[in-house]
């Protein structure tokens, strides 16, 4: 087959209630298993506004080095991946959740984003590269678990880092040494995405602390004015 002969492929999973037996068997060959449901983050430093809007930890490597320490990646409605490594399989992690992610097997009927009875919890992979070596031949599988990961909308939410990741992966698949991606100029305001904990802090600063500081400054000025008037 193509992969057995040293082929390269990219797979992006999506949530479905159908039994994808053949699809799962392909992933099994590369030590990859996929959770049945969708991941919710309970760590507010790893999601944006909605616990299904994941902002994973970016592992620094060849594919993420341009933005791993300076930008976020936006991965909404992702499934969880578990990737095994052995003598035949070499794994490069790219995107992972916090250790507090929760699998929601039936997201349409769930009652809470928090862990409930029967929910699987832990850290999950959202993106990885798996190299399989057999008979001195190495094949490569890139696997990602959010079908919205490489859309323009998701990439724009984080300043284009999703597109940077996609470009690096495609370069590897096509065996290009480098590629220049020039975004089309659009006269639209770029979205700024921050994790939920930072979003809450900024909100408290704007709604509570800033008015208090302004009120305090006003009182100080008034007291000084009254004191000066009575001199």
List where the protein language model places each region:
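Intrinsically disordered or highly flexible coil/loop and linker segments, enriched in small
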Residues: 178-182, 214
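Short, aromatic-rich amphipathic segments at membrane interfaces
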Residues: 181-204
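Conserved small/polar residues in nucleotide/adenosyl-binding loops
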Residues: 229-230
